Regions:
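Nucleotide phosphate-binding/pyrophosphate-handling subdomain across enzymes
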Residues: 1-72
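C-terminal helical cap/extension that packs against the catalytic core
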Residues: 13-14, 62-130
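Structural beta-sheet core signal
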Residues: 46-48, 76, 133
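Surface-exposed, flexible loop/turn segments at secondary-structure boundaries
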Residues: 52-54, 82, 116, 139
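Active-site-proximal loop/hinge segments that shape catalytic or ion-binding/gating pockets
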Residues: 136
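Active-site-adjacent alpha-helix immediately C-terminal to a catalytic or transition-state-stabilizing loop
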Residues: 141-149
């Protein structure tokens, strides 16, 4: 669970992938490029949350790499804390990453919760569209705990 797992957000495809380092971010982006290879124009709504101490800039560069016909938009969210049994794990504040995303000319917002970000993502009714939750296995855990019903 939590690795290249397809779900649905209403009628919108939703991909869960815990991609939490540069290598897994590159693998996720390559997978998405393959999935969208025959789609001339598509939107990816990213819902991302990161642990403190991660190489976020490298992960963002891998995930948000420009491609003709592909439009990115990002919601940054924290994951729930404390992480059960791991009090040393801390979520990076979403505001700590906004400038890095915006420096890549990508629309970026922050939300206080995964639920709020999913509501925002579901309101997007443009071209072919997918939603991807990534950046932390703890964020994927939040999805299963709070929103899978």
């Amino acid at each position: 669970e939590g690795r290249c797992e397809w779900m649905e957000l209403g009628a919108v495809p939703l991909l869960l992938d815990g991609a939490h380092n540069e290598a897994s971010a590159l693998a996720l982006r390559q997978y998405l490029d393959q999935c969208l290879a025959k789609t001339p124009s598509a939107d990816i709504t990213w819902i991302m949350g990161f642990s403190c101490g991660k190489e976020v800039h490298a992960m963002l560069q891998a995930l948000l790499c420009p491609r003709k016909g592909l439009y990115h938009r990002v919601s940054l969210v924290p994951f729930s804390m404390p992480v059960e049994g791991m009090p040393w794990v801390k979520a990076m504040l979403p505001e700590e990453c906004t400038s890095a995303v915006r420096s890549m000319n990508v629309e970026c917002v922050t939300h206080d919760s995964l639920r709020d970000a999913l509501t925002w993502a579901s309101l997007h009714d443009q071209r072919p569209h997918i939603v991807v939750i990534c950046g932390s296995l703890y964020l994927i855990g939040d999805y299963y705990r709070q929103l899978s019903f």
